[in-house]
Amino acid sequence: MMDSRILEHPHAQFGGSLGSMVGMGFPYHLGHHHVYDISGHQLQSAAAVPFSIDGLLNGSCSGSVANSNPLLGSGCGVNGDSQYKLGDGGDPDKESPGCKRRRTRTNFTGWQLEELEKASNESHYPDVFMREALALRLDLVESRVQVWFQNRRAKWRKKENTKKGPGRPAHNSHPTTCSGEPMDPEEIARRELERLEKKKRKQERKLLKSQNKLLAGELFHTPGSDSDSGVSQSTDSESTPHTGPQHSAHRQQTEHICEQHARHQRASTVNETAEPMDSTRNSGLCPANGITRASTLQKLNPFSVESLLADSSPRRKTILDFSQLPPQRPLVGKGHFLLYPITQPLGFIVPQTAMKQSHDSGNSGHHCSTTDTSTSNQKNVNHLCRDNTGASDELQRETKNSSIQSPSTSSEKCFSESNSPQKESENDSESTVTNSSQKESISANLSEYSDRKSRSSADTNTDGEDVDMD
């Protein structure tokens, strides 16, 4: 800001540098020949200090050192008294036509607001005399009273024309139809009732959905749920024909294993270590308490109300009953479907211990296991025992192949595979006759196999002696 005291000296001239300095805050460029070209009435009105910035910028205002800001006083006021008011801060409610000074916000006291409210209740449109009387009595400016009444009328119109509550979107009229006519109050009430009913139904659906989700989560974690059935009733039409034959084959295989277990219990009681594990395994596979696979097919969806309220015992036993067995891979997938088609019955693992050959021949009806007890080494021979009408031929081929195999693991796996499924209409007498004939053929083949093994061992010993003699 340039100090105006420099220009108070009577001999001060407008030089080039001074003209450039004045040009920063002055909109007109001043030069040496433009100094005295200002209009004559402005120079005469500013005769006291002819060359002051205030006199040049404000032709009608007298120069003053108190007003150090020439831009603020430019064109402001009609007489010189307005500059002294601006220097003191001025009256904020004083309206000057040429001054664009920002007005501060008027803060009304509680008493002033009460008096204004009383006046607005009497009349919404007070005349100028009433506004001036209120301004004198409330120590306000008449313009502020006028603005307050304008705002109060706008507030009243909004309140009268709008029926909105807190939080509702603002609308300034009653609900109307498409043609713009006002709606019937009964129609408005009916729509409001429909809106409330729709909101209530939505909340009920949300609550029911959350309950079903929670119930489904609990059923997935319960060990006794009926989710281990081979087929689910709520499947698609595409996957149903694939799962039906698999389930029927699985049922026939389970029945076949149970029949073998019954024959084995009647046959012999040798091999006491392997016997309890077979009975435990087969008891888990055989149907108990009248629960069959057919009843599982007829059962409803496991998530239905009937299946939830039914008192069903768990199908699978806990891991404590099978603690000495290796972990098994589940045959049922996540969507209760079989992971792969089963073409043979489910096998079970029989832990093998050191047994004599007599025990093996006595227990050959079910386990079909052979042990080579020679003085040099002991061999565990893995062979596949097939329980069908042509079992004798299959056994001879397997024994020939098994004599060449090297010593393998200490446990033998016996898989009973039925290539031709038994028919349900077969009589008990015929099945017992065929089983006895099969047992006789298997025992005869085992005796021939033992003789052949003894001869082969003798031949190998003589061959070894010949090599030593050479």
Curated annotation (Swiss-Prot):
UniProt xrefs under SUPFAM superfamilies: Homeodomain-like
Region (Disordered): 83-102, 157-185, 199-289, 355-470
Main location: nucleus
Basic and acidic residues bias spans: 252-262
Tissues and organs where the protein is expressed, per its UniProt entry: In the somite, it is restricted to the caudal half of the newly formed somite and sclerotome.
GO molecular function terms listed in the Swiss-Prot or TrEMBL record: DNA-binding transcription factor activity, RNA polymerase II-specific; sequence-specific double-stranded DNA binding
Subcellular location: Nucleus
A GO cellular component annotation in the UniProt record: nucleus
Polar residues bias locations: 224-246, 355-381, 401-422, 430-448
SMART domains: HOX
Keywords recorded for this protein, A-Z: Developmental protein, Differentiation, DNA-binding, Homeobox, Neurogenesis, Nucleus, Transcription, Transcription regulation
Residue spans binding DNA: 101-160
Gene Ontology terms: biological process: cell differentiation; nervous system development; regulation of gene expression
Pfam hit, one: Homeodomain
Further remark: Marker of antero-posterior subdivisions of the somite.
Physiological role: Transcription factor involved in somitogenesis and neurogenesis.
Record family assignment: Belongs to the paired homeobox family. Unc-4 subfamily.
Stated name of the protein: Homeobox protein unc-4 homolog
